[in-house]
Amino acid sequence: MAAMPDNTHSTDSGRQRTQRRRARLFALRSPIPHSVSLSVTIGLFLSLFGLWALASYGEWVRPVFLPTPTGVLQRAVTLYQQEILVRDLWISNVRVFSGFLMAVVVAIPLGMLAGNMRIFSAAIDPFMGFLRYMPVPAFIPLLVLYAGIDELPKILLIFIGTVVQMTIMVGDVTRQVQADLIRAAMVLGANGREIFRKVIWKGSLPGIVDTLRINLGFAWTYLVVAELVAADEGMGFRILRSQRFMQTDTIFLYILLIGLLGIIFDFLFRRFHRWAFPWSQEGLRK
Amino acid sequence: MSAFRLEATDLTRTFESGSQAVVALQSMTLQVGAAQVVCLVGPSGCGKSTFLSLAAGLDEPTQGSLYIDGVAIEGPGADRGMVFQKDCLFPWLSVRDNVRFGLGLLETRRSHGASMRRLREHCDELLDRVGLWPFRDSYPSQLSGGMRQRAGIVRALATRPAVLLMDEPFGALDAQTREDMQILLLELCREQATTVIFVTHDVEEAVFLGDRVLVMKPRPGRVVADVAVNLPASRDRHTKLQQDFQAIRGEVLDHLYQVMSNAEPSG
Ligand SMILES: Nc1ncnc2c1ncn2[C@@H]1O[C@H](COP(=O)(O)OP(=O)(O)OP(=O)(O)O)[C@@H](O)[C@H]1O
Ligand SMILES: [Mg+2]
């Protein structure tokens, strides 16, 4: 890190102080000022946006490959007026969350059982390992065969895509509750059920919420695949169809919207985590 | 008073690891009276923690038995409390809820409203005694190591156990805090007439706290010496400077050196 030449008038110690402050920004696992953190985040988005604007308005790239920001915005307005945009957003959210919630309902109990009772881990762990490497899109023909072409196969595909990973992750999370805490509870007189409820479950919860946050992202990545199945609306469907008509602006719009949804859900999950588990926050002690 | 508070007869615990069998504890016989403090010292692997686990009811002996007031130990019970080397507080509970954890469990089992209220008050009193009252609503991660360990002790004492089992509880503390904790522990246990089994690596600590110091040796784990600490019951910082204290400390150290030198060649 070279010293910036902007403080020629300041004293030696002044420059040293700036240097030290700058070095601290790169210290391992140390907090940095909130303002710095925020400006780095916004700065990255803005510069990417700037690059996009430059390349598209400056016509470095042909418009059919790279639409302009205003082009994308216009497309958004058009699709909104045609009542397509909201409809697509709604139906895709319904699909993603239905599949995701199904996976949650299955994965949390399975993961908790696998993580805490050997007899269940003997059954569940190898089976999940067996399922884990299977390519999810390969299930589409079977799903269509079994579940038709309505909403069910699309939701099931998202379910299949997330449930395995989620079960494995919940199992790992609950295994991480320290054996020492379980021993402490036993000595205090807790029986098996109480240990499960008051120690293992409580101790796993923050990790489970984190697991859900990560897996919601996975669920969204399966959306496009799910909407390969005889869909006529939805964000994934719209992206695929726009390719056929070379509507790159629509593709951009929908990809960006999915990214935006990702940021929003992530934020909400983190907020919830901080609110629900104040005890597990890093840097609680200050 | 025929029965001892804590009694071990021919207590043996072997661990099968692969083809080998490790005798963690061999034919240990021990009698501890009410309100006595017994310290266990010995090199690593001599079965100190194994004994505590057995006494806590977390583990079962291969042979022999353990009794509390003449009743054989079968699993953990409210008559025994345990303090671990790591504080082992539940991170999601406030200090006060941690301390009341055992009470909460008791409450769901029986409904002695009046005695429960007394125990709750007792909890709060103890918190106050150890200086944690202002921190009762804090989470463990917000406390210092010494404060956490104090909370751990209060939690173990909350249900007024007859026997307190402690496995190197002060090992991770700095010297000053450690000494404060030793004095505090003696005070609290004397008030409640608690019997204490205290495991430590620190001979000075053992002599300071104990009415007796047991020296153990590994492979197989056995008690090789039972040193009586004939010092006045009330102990403070000056105790450690006394000649008697140093003499007993020397005696324990001699036993320890002997154990070490015997254990070394056999590997
Ligand atoms: N669960 C177990 N499985 C196999 N062997 C064990 C187990 N627990 C203890 N042992 C063995 O029993 C012996 C005694 O162990 P223990 O933990 O009681 O020693 P310790 O005196 O507490 O040692 P330290 O001072 O290091 O804590 C050791 O040789 C150890 O390897
Ligand atoms: Mg030990």
List PLM regions with ranges.
Chain B
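The feature captures the beta-strand-to-loop junction immediately N-terminal to the Walker
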Residues: 41-43
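Helix-to-loop junction immediately C-terminal to a conserved catalytic motif
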Residues: 56
